[in-house]
Amino acid sequence: MSNKKIEQWEIERYWEIFSSLANGHPRLNSSQAASVLRNSRLSDDQLEKVWDLADVDGDGELDFEEFCVAMRLVFDLVNGELQAVPRVLPDWLVPETKAHLVQAGRALSDRPEQFERIEDEDDTPGLKDGFDWYMKPSDKSKYEEIYSANRNHRGEITFESLQGLYDSLDVPDTDIRSAWNLVNPSASLAINKDATLAFLHILNYRHEGFRIPRTIPASLRASFENNKIDYQIDNARPAQRWGADGDRETPTGRKAKFGDTYLSRLGVGGKGSYTPKGTDFSDTIQDEEWEKVRLRRELSELQAKLDAANKASEGRRDRPRNDGRPNWTLIKKEALQLLEYKERELRELREGTGRAKAGQDLERLREDIRTVGEQVEGLKSHLAQRKEVLADLRSQIEEERARR
């Protein structure tokens, strides 16, 4: 199984883009998403395939989970993690809430897995008769714990989801598949809860040394479709009710009880609990991130060209470098310096330092100069008024002197 996943920091960045494009709506249409997807400079054919993969529910729009899938596919293509758009969506990219849609789509394109029916022509020696369809309350509780720990979003169980249980049992693979075929006559990809409980009940008895029944009662088979299996003890025939004791020890006395080891490993059946985990989209890329990605892509292309040039120049390294050919080492160095310069500019813009800070200081200085200029004009006006008053006083003094 792949260890890849969409990290939380990616989800947060994708949310910033999604929320800015969606304007409060829960989905993006193709026009809204095109503005950011086309910045990747992928071809329209590639972007069309990415859209078709990400639009899991096929409604022609992308909700946030589907948008995260599309963005991750685009970044993997740009960064060279993917050489081409995959034909089907990788399992690790499938949103947990839409897994059933992907499974249904695959079921329509592929035939469901059907196991060969194993007919027990000669009974396995050492097995006992007396299989009882009645489920004791303690057994039923254990079956329900196993079911709850492995069910999908539709409340169904697939054959592969119980592989850990099969490994803990003393039951041959052929018998396990025979039991599955018995409770799954339609050869579906998954079975519902009632069929699962019956399947686990058969495995329990086989684990305890009882033969697997060859048929299922008609009423019980019908109840798999109606979800109404009758577990009432009063409805069971006395001969069947006491046909076997589910609490008896196993023949070896050392074999673990059915499902105990498996439930212990899952952390259920006691104080623990088990909850399947997938990518959590409940919790959020800026345009400059595309520039970083493009620069890294150009750098990788330059690196590839450099490697090709080095291979072509093997045996001629001592030749003087005056033939006009490009200096790939210098080109790589300049590309790295350009990347560092762009990242430093982005950092200064975010932090308000460097040239961004100098620009802010210059603006403040201009504002101060404007303020001082206004104050000077005010002082000049005040000085002119005082000069007029002084001239008037001098005129009055001269008139007094003339009178005397």
Swiss-Prot record:
Keywords: Actin-binding, Calcium, Cell membrane, Coiled coil, Cytoplasm, Cytoskeleton, Endocytosis, Endosome, Membrane, Metal-binding, Repeat. Ca(2+) binds at D55, D57, D59, E61, E66. One of its GO terms (biological process) is actin filament organization. GO terms for molecular function: actin binding; calcium ion binding. Residues 281-404 form a coiled coil. InterPro entries: EF-hand-dom_pair, EF_Hand_1_Ca_BS, EF_hand_dom, EH_dom, End3. GO terms for cellular component: actin cortical patch; endosome membrane; plasma membrane. Residues 10-100, 139-227 form the EH domain. It comes from the Eukaryota. Residues 313-324 have a biased composition (Basic and acidic residues). It is found in: Cell membrane; Endosome membrane; Cytoplasm, Cytoskeleton, Actin patch. Pfam families: EH, End3. The keyword Iron does not apply. Residues 42-77 form the EF-hand domain. Residues 306-327 are annotated as: Disordered. Belongs to the END3 family. Component of the PAN1 actin cytoskeleton-regulatory complex. Component of the PAN1 actin cytoskeleton-regulatory complex required for the internalization of endosomes during actin-coupled endocytosis. The complex links the site of endocytosis to the cell membrane-associated actin cytoskeleton. Mediates uptake of external molecules and vacuolar degradation of plasma membrane proteins. Plays a role in the proper organization of the cell membrane-associated actin cytoskeleton and promotes its destabilization. This is Actin cytoskeleton-regulatory complex protein end3. It comes from Neosartorya fischeri (strain ATCC 1020 / DSM 3700 / CBS 544.65 / FGSC A1164 / JCM 1740 / NRRL 181 / WB 181) (Aspergillus fischerianus). The gene is end3.
